[in-house]
């Protein structure tokens, strides 16, 4: 199946040509925006969240055609296959059952395994939080260091930061991912080996960055007084390869299992989230799962016309494949959600940044847009200039938390006002005539610089309060959005072959950096020159 061979495609293309030059300002004009208002018609709820799609460049007819596109592309069938545990990751011959990690139905796939591992996590987290689990000198754990990269880092880091307000104040959680030694070194400056627990997270337990950092941390413990025989008090492992964890030197009792039917970027709900559970406690971790389950149920049961993940995905396709948008922005007006854009970068681009269809043919249409973002209001003072007046179309997801999770409540109306005002300004713009009035007769030459084209599309997601449950729903919303887009593009969102070639060549280059001699013909001239400069700097 190719996207532009679907029966609905010509109708969508004709509809795009019909409305491409229409301006949102006109659709919101009082003469056109009668009851039910545009905001009422295009605001939908699900999983405890609300989404206002009204400031997007679409009409009722657009949504009807996009929903038809989803049905013709088999979105519902792909969704149902994923939940049923079918092989939806054909290139690796695997299911993608991250939803099973938060299911509560006894007949859901792998429930006995999931429940047993979560109970083990809870016992361990309670022991660490209560002080029953101590370091080698008998001191309680005050620092948890999570070592992992990609999905073993981005998800847990994002959630721990977001839920800081409900986390225990007795334990500081640190995250180390980069093979650059500066990342680990800066954490080592802030921790005490007698009071530190390391969680090493790697599906294979062979990941270069993770194992390099893990070995350096283990050496640091020993160099700072921890007997090798006592390292079991300070190291636990999370992996789908328990034998390799034990080989590293972690006690078998300290191994937590993840499974190959859960992709790394979808894994925070598993033992990969052990650092989350230690920070917020098992009960609140269960609330996080419950929120994701709320969104799972909404995604499974709501008609596509009112289905938040489906609508999110389809609106993204509208801009990517018709308007030609090359990127989209996530702007959470919440400092607690500081790491959400980074998390979504991996979720969206590693999942859907593909050029091969499931059937092995190459696509002849764009797939994943570049995902980027920054919390508000910081972004307003960095790149919103380009969003308002630049020539590039960048669709935006605003995320607003309506009640603060901190005691400085007087700040919150200012934060929300900026969020809502930005969406209004991006939609309305300012005409040249309006700009001339502002510039006045004294400075008419200023008018073009005061003009805003407007018609910049935004979606605003509303969260009543940032809790473990609403955060779980928000994350699951984006997970399912990715699946919807993958189904329409007919690609596999659950593999990541694009990271392999660089890894393979990286091992070759690393060996050349320290070899006695290097054959200059082994690499292209640019890479050979880079290696030569680095060898000189390294003293080789």
From Swiss-Prot:
- Give yes or no: UniProt keyword Membrane: no
What is an example of a GO molecular function annotated in this UniProt entry?
glucose-6-phosphate isomerase activity
| Pathway assigned in UniProt | Carbohydrate biosynthesis; gluconeogenesis; Carbohydrate degradation; glycolysis; D-glyceraldehyde 3-phosphate and glycerone phosphate from D-glucose: step 2/4
Q: Give the catalysed reaction(s), semicolon-separated.
A: alpha-D-glucose 6-phosphate = beta-D-fructose 6-phosphate
Localization recorded for this chain is: Cytoplasm
Entry-linked Gene3D superfamilies: 1.10.1390.10, Glucose-6-phosphate isomerase like protein, domain 1
Q: Provide this UniProt record's keywords sorted from A to Z.
A: Cytoplasm, Gluconeogenesis, Glycolysis, Isomerase
Question: Can you cite a GO biological process for this protein?
Answer: gluconeogenesis
Provide the active-site residues from the annotation: 350, 381, 503
Q: Which of the seven top EC classes does this enzyme belong to?
A: isomerase
Tell me which GO cellular component terms the UniProt record holds. cytosol
Q: Where are the transmembrane segments?
A: none
Function recorded in the entry: Catalyzes the reversible isomerization of glucose-6-phosphate to fructose-6-phosphate.
NCBIfam families, alphabetically?
Answer: PRK00179.1
Q: Give the record's family classification.
A: Belongs to the GPI family.
Protein name per the record: Glucose-6-phosphate isomerase
What's the source species for this entry?
Answer: Burkholderia pseudomallei (strain 668)
């Amino acid at each position: 199946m190719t996207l532009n061979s679907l029966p609905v495609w010509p109708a969508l293309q004709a509809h795009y040509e019909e409305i491409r030059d229409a301006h949102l300002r006109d659709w919101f004009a009082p003469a056109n925006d009668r009851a039910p208002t545009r905001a009422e018609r295009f605001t939908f709820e699900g999983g405890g969240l609300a989404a206002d799609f009204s400031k997007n460049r679409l009409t009722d007819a657009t949504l009807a055609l996009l929903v038809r596109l989803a049905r013709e592309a088999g979105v519902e069938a792909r969704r149902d296959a994923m939940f049923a545990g079918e092989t939806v990751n054909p290139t690796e011959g695997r299911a993608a059952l991250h939803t099973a990690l938060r299911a509560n139905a006894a007949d859901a796939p792998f429930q006995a395994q999931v429940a047993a591992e979560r109970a083990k996590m809870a016992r361990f987290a309670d022991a660490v939080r209560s002080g029953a689990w101590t370091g080698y000198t008998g001191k309680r754990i005050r620092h948890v260091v999570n070592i992992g990269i990609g999905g073993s880092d981005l998800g847990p880091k994002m959630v721990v930061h977001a839920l800081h307000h409900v986390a225990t104040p007795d334990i500081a959680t640190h995250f180390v991912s980069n093979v650059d030694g500066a990342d680990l070194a800066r954490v080592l400056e802030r921790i005490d080996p007698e009071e530190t627990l390391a969680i090493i997270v790697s599906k294979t337990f062979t990941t270069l960055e993770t194992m390099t950092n893990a070995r350096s941390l283990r050496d640091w413990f020993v160099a700072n007084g921890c007997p090798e025989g006592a390292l079991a008090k300070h190291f636990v492992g999370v992996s789908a390869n328990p034998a390799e964890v034990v080989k590293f030197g972690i006690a078998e009792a300290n191994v937590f299992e993840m499974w190959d039917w859960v992709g790394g970027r979808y894994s925070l709900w598993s033992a990969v989230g052990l650092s989350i559970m230690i920070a917020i406690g098992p009960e609140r971790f269960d609330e996080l799962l419950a929120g994701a389950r709320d969104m799972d149920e909404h995604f499974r049961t709501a008609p596509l016309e009112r289905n938040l993940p489906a609508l999110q995905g389809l609106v993204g396709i509208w801009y990517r494949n018709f308007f030609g948008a090359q990127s989209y922005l996530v702007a959470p007006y919440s400092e607690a959600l500081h790491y959400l854009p980074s998390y979504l970068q991996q979720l969206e681009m590693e999942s859907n940044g593909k050029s091969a269809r499931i059937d092995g043919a190459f696509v002849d249409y764009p797939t994943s847009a570049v995902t980027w973002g920054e919390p508000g209001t910081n972004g307003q003072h960095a790149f919103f200039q380009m969003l308002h007046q630049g020539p590039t179309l960048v669709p935006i997801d605003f995320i607003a938390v309506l009640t603060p999770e901190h005691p400085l409540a007087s700040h919150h109306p200012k934060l929300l006002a900026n969020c809502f005002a930005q969406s209004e300004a991006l939609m309305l713009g300012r005409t040249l005539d309006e700009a001339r009035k502002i510039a006045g007769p004294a400075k008419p030459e200023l008018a073009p610089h005061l003009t805003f084209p407007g018609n910049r599309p935004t979606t605003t997601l509303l969260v009543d309060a940032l809790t473990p449950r609403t955060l779980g729903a928000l994350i699951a919303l984006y997970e399912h959005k990715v699946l919807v887009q993958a189904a329409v593009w007919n690609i596999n969102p659950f593999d990541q072959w694009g990271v392999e070639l660089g890894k393979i060549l990286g091992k070759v280059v690393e060996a050349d950096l320290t070899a006695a001699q290097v054959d200059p013909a082994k690499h292209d001239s640019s890479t050979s020159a880079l290696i030569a400069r680095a060898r000189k700097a390294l003293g080789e």
